[in-house]
Amino acid sequence: MSQDNDTLMRDILGHELAAMRLQKLEQQRRLFEKKQRQKRQELLMVQANPDASPWLWRSCLREERLLGDRGLGNPFLRKKVSEAHLPSGIHSALGTVSCGGDGRGERGLPTPRTEAVFRNLGLQSPFLSWLPDNSDAELEEVSVENGSVSPPPFKQSPRIRRKGWQAHQRPGTRAEGESDSQDMGDAHKSPNMGPNPGMDGDCVYENLAFQKEEDLEKKREASESTGTNSSAAHNEELSKALKGEGGTDSDHMRHEASLAIRSPCPGLEEDMEAYVLRPALPGTMMQCYLTRDKHGVDKGLFPLYYLYLETSDSLQRFLLAGRKRRRSKTSNYLISLDPTHLSRDGDNFVGKVRSNVFSTKFTIFDNGVNPDREHLTRNTARIRQELGAVCYEPNVLGYLGPRKMTVILPGTNSQNQRINVQPLNEQESLLSRYQRGDKQGLLLLHNKTPSWDKENGVYTLNFHGRVTRASVKNFQIVDPKHQEHLVLQFGRVGPDTFTMDFCFPFSPLQAFSICLSSFN
C-alpha cells in the first residue's frame, strides 16, 4: 500500500508541475502580445499598408536596376573614359527619373560619381585618410610605423602602351560632387503645375528640364571664365614670388607657390612615357600620393607601389607602379606604366632603380639596355640613360638619427631639358663622377636637416600640413644654395599611404624612384 501511495503522489506532483509550466508559458505569451500591440499603437511606428501591392513595387525596382546596369543606358560603359571628359549634362544619368502617366516626375537619389565610375570600371576606391590642412605650420615627428594595405588601382590589359589615364575623385571632394548632383537634381525637378491639355506630360517635363539645364550651363560658363582669369592672375603672382620679385609678402607667397601651383596634366592621347620622363615645368608644384600594397603571400617582402597625380580638378590620376624584383642580388625596383604587368619585358616598362650591395647608393635608369649586354640584344636597342643617383650616409649619431641624403641629377640646358648621360662603363657613371669630385654638369641636392624637439625628444620637419604621421621615411630635398626652396618632399599620411610633392628639375619618374629607395 505504501508503494502505491508513493507512486500516486509522484504522479500528482508531476501533473501539477506540468500545469504550472503551461501557465507560465501562457502568461509570457500574453505579455509578449501586449507589448507588440503597444508598439503598433505608437505614432512613430511604421505600419504596413494592406492595400499596397508589393509585387508592383518590386518589379519597378528590378526594372530600374536593370536599366542602370545595362550598357546602353549607362554612359560610363560606352567608353572607358573618365567622368571629367564626359559632356555636360550626362551626369544626370546618375539619378533615376521615373515619370508616370500624370506627367509628374520623381527623381531618385543620385549615385555618387566616384562609386559610379569605379563600379562600372570594376574597381575599388583606394583607401586614403585625408586630414584638413591647418593654417598654422604643423610639425611632424620622426619614428617608425607599420600598418595595413591599400588596394591596387584600376586594371588594364598588358602589352599595350598606355596613353592618357583613368581618373577617380578624391575622398575630400565628395561634398563638391554632392552639390553638383544636387544642382542637377534641381534642374530636373518639375514645378507644381499640371501638363498642358495639348501636350503629353513627359514632353512638358523634358522641355522644362532642358531649359533649366541650359540656364545652369550658361551660369557655369560665366563662373569658369571668371575663375580662369583670377587663377591666371594668382599664378602670375606666385611665379613672381618664386623668382624673388615679391614685396613684403614674398615669403608667404613663396611658400604658397611651392604648394599651390600644379603642373598641367597630359591629354588622353599624350604619350605617358614621355610625360613621366619630362621634368616638371618651372614654377609649378606637382602634388602626388603613393600607396603601398602588401596583400598576398609574397607582397609582405615584395610589396607593390602605386603613384597617383593630384590634379587641379580634385581628381587622382594613375601615373606609375613599381615593385621590387624577387630574384636579384641587390635591391632592384622595376617601374612600369601598367599596374598589372610590372615586367622588364612589358611594353610599359619605363625604368628601374638599382642599389649597391649595402643598399646605401641607388642609381636610376630608364628602359634602355645595359652597355655590357648590348651584343645580346637586337641592333636597334638603345643604351640606357642614368637619370639620377641617391646616396645615403649615417649622421654623426650613427644609425640612431635621421639619415643624410644626397641626390645627384644630370644638369639641364637653357631649354630646361635634361642632359643625356649614357655611361659606357662604371667610371663614367654619376656616382663615380661624384666620388672623384667631377661635379661639372651635375646638380647636387641634399635633404633638409631636421630640428631636434627637446620637449618631445624627436626630430621634426615642417611639412605645412601635407604630412600627418611620423615616420623615418619622411624627408625633404632642398637646394643647398636655397634652403627654404623645397624641390621634393615625401611623408606618411596613412598606414600605407604617403604624399609626394616635387617640382623642377625632377620628373615624375625621378621623384618616384627616390621615394622607392627610401623604403629599402
Curated annotation (Swiss-Prot):
Where is it mainly found? cytoplasm
GO biological process: any one?
A: protein localization to cilium
Q: Which residues form a coiled coil?
A: none
Q: In which tissues is it expressed?
A: Strongly expressed in testis. Also expressed in retina. Expressed in cancer cell lines.
Q: GO cellular component terms? A: cilium; cytoplasm; extracellular region
* Location of Phosphoserine modifications: 135, 190
Keywords from the named record? Cytoplasm, Phosphoprotein, Secreted
Q: Where is the composition biased (Polar residues)?
A: 224-233
Please list the GO terms describing molecular function: protein-containing complex binding
Pfam families given in the database record: Tub, Tub_N
Please give the annotated consequence of changing residue 149 to I. Answer: Found in a renal cell carcinoma sample; somatic mutation
Places the protein is found: Cytoplasm; Secreted
Biased amino acid composition, Basic and acidic residues: 211-223
The ranges of region (Disordered) come to 141-236
The similarity annotation says: Belongs to the TUB family.
PANTHER family of this UniProt entry? TUBBY-RELATED, TUBBY-RELATED PROTEIN 2
* Name of this chain's protein: Tubby-related protein 2
